[in-house]
A protein has these predicted regions:
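A conserved acidic beta->alpha catalytic loop
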Residues: 39, 50-62, 73
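Cell-envelope/extracellular polymer assembly enzymes that use nucleotide-activated donors
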Residues: 19-21
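Active-site nucleotide-sugar/metal-binding loop of Leloir-type enzymes
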Residues: 63, 82-94
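Acidic helix N-cap motif at the loop->helix transition within catalytic regions
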Residues: 31-34, 55-64, 107-108
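Catalytic-site signature of metal-activated, phosphate-bearing donor transferases
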Residues: 5-6, 78-79, 85, 105-295
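Short beta-strand/loop segment that forms part of the nucleotide-sugar
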Residues: 24, 43-53, 69-70, 100
Length: 316
């Protein structure tokens, strides 16, 4: 991977800012980026990790005083966040990972300042408030992600899925792990994509491709735990263990709808909530369809053998 970095802002202009580095992975985010940058302007360092955007993303970042690092993906791991944690010029102990369609509210900023000054924990989970088609969805919460952490203790989880074709250069549902103590902040991140529903649908089609490979991997592996060991897991690993159970359940699209619309009370979120829950059910259906396609291809490759397989592709 190669990297180019903008000149650092003057230390004079940074003197009164919070000793925090914000990592912002982006690609063609000119619509979302200004609001995201404005919401963390109080941070001492902002690093925008770009993938050679063809719009005004890099120019917007530089104009806001952020450093721009260009990431070149080689088709295999690491992907963008993992690479940035290891290679970006991070100069603060504390790091906040922020997506371009997210905003740090005033309440969350105050909490971040307090916990960094206190230094009682090594990482913090942050909830997300999701704005969907103009409405804040109560059914989406809580949605905890570990986003604030001590840099030296953090790493991206590795599901061995960095080379799945057609899924881009940024992590999808891998999470950050911290070798230390963690806690939960009260105020949420605001998640509001200005690109609208079309971008959401396109993004989740890509996610479904990646998830299909993960589902296939998990279904081909043993569970690897029993009830006693499951009960001893921490919250993060218990969630991962539940996912291995989930991929084995029948009727997942229906279960997904019931979970979101009934158990998580999506029916209280109006027509936007109903639309979101239907789309999440369809998302689960798409994952299953793509997993069936993968199994069919696997069976065909086994049946014809590698040499015949090459000849068929050449003939096509």
């Amino acid at each position: 991977m190669c990297m180019t970095v903008d000149p650092q802002p003057s230390m004079l202009s940074q003197r009164k800012k919070l000793p925090l580095t914000v990592l912002l992975p982006v690609l063609n985010e000119e619509l979302n980026l200004p609001a995201a940058l404005a919401s963390v302007a109080w941070a001492e360092q902002i690093i925008v990790v770009d993938s050679h955007s063809t719009d005004a993303t890099a120019a917007i970042a530089r104009a806001a005083g952020a450093e721009v690092v260009q990431f070149d993906y080689a088709g295999v791991g690491p992907k963008k966040k993992a690479w940035a944690l290891a290679n970006a010029p991070i100069r603060n102990e504390w790091v906040l990972v922020l997506d371009a369609d997210e905003r740090v509210t005033g309440a969350l900023r105050a909490e971040i300042e307090d916990v960094i000054v206190a230094g009682d924990r090594d990482g913090y989970y942050i909830d997300r408030e999701f704005i969907f088609m103009g409405r804040s969805l109560r059914c989406f919460r809580p949605n905890w992600n570990l986003r604030l952490f001590r840099h030296r203790l953090a790493r991206m989880e590795d599901l061995q899925m960095a080379d799945v074709p057609g899924t881009g250069d940024n992590e999808i549902h891998e999470h950050i792990e911290v070798a230390g103590t963690t806690a939960y902040l009260r105020a949420p991140l605001l998640h509001d994509d200005d690109r609208g529903l079309t971008a959401w649908l396109s993004r989740h089609n890509t996610y479904a491709t990646w998830e299909a490979h993960v589902y296939r991997k998990f279904r081909n592996e043993p569970l690897g735990f029993g009830l006693p060991s499951f009960l001893r897991l921490d919250a993060f690993r218990r969630k991962r263990a539940l996912r291995r159970i989930w991929v084995r359940l029948p009727g997942r699209p229906l279960l997904r709808f019931v979970t979101w619309y009934v158990a998580r009370r999506g029916f209280l979120d109006g027509w936007q909530g109903f639309t979101f829950c239907v789309l999440m059910s369809y998302y689960e259906f798409t994952i299953g369809a793509k997993m069936c396609e993968l199994r069919t291809r696997d069976a065909q490759n086994v049946a014809v053998g590698p040499q015949d397989s090459v000849e068929v592709r050449d003939a096509a």
